[in-house]
Amino acid sequence: DTGALAISPSLYTKLSFDPSRDLKGVTMLAYSPHLLVVHPSVPATTLAELVALSKTQPLNFAVTALGSAPHLAGVAVERATGAKWQYIPYKGGSQAIADTVGGQAQVLMNGMLATLPHVQSGKLKLIGVSKRTRMPLIGGTPTIAEQGVKDFESGTWQGLLMPASTPPAILSRLNAELSRIIRSTDIRAKLVGQGAEVVTMTVPEFDRFFNAE
């Protein structure tokens, strides 16, 4: 998840490296939105109902990692709606998901690829998707933006970066090969089936995107 690298300079004053200076982008590979989900016992089916419930009884919000994209997305929703989350930090997404499935936490914002199987199995209830348009894969569930958080969009993007000293010829070769592989019919179908968008970029395009993020 290369998004974490883009977030770090804004959160930490003493990094041992500068992502923009020390890394060179090869290409983006895939992007997937975040899903806002709750434990099935939570008596809410919409964002408005969830926000109203949180104001009467603060809900435990599982954070996959402090300062992660899902954490910041949860904070953005809280600030925009007035929701009351009690943040519970974890050291990774798998434990955050496990505790939400188990009911120790009631709310979770997490990447679609890791979270969707638990929605499909009924272990988690989907409230909204952090994409500007609805996704047929999840039955047209309303987006968070549609439910009152104007223009809200967040997600997880995967890509490959190398040390800045990597020769341009190697970056170009890796870019070409990875783009070819990720666009192949079977790989694309598998990623799309899990809720990801296949996204490839040239080396300069990925550099511009990464620095903008």
Model-assigned labels for residue ranges:
Residues 10-95, 144, 157-190:
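Hinge/capping helix and adjacent helix->loop/strand transition within the periplasmic-binding protein
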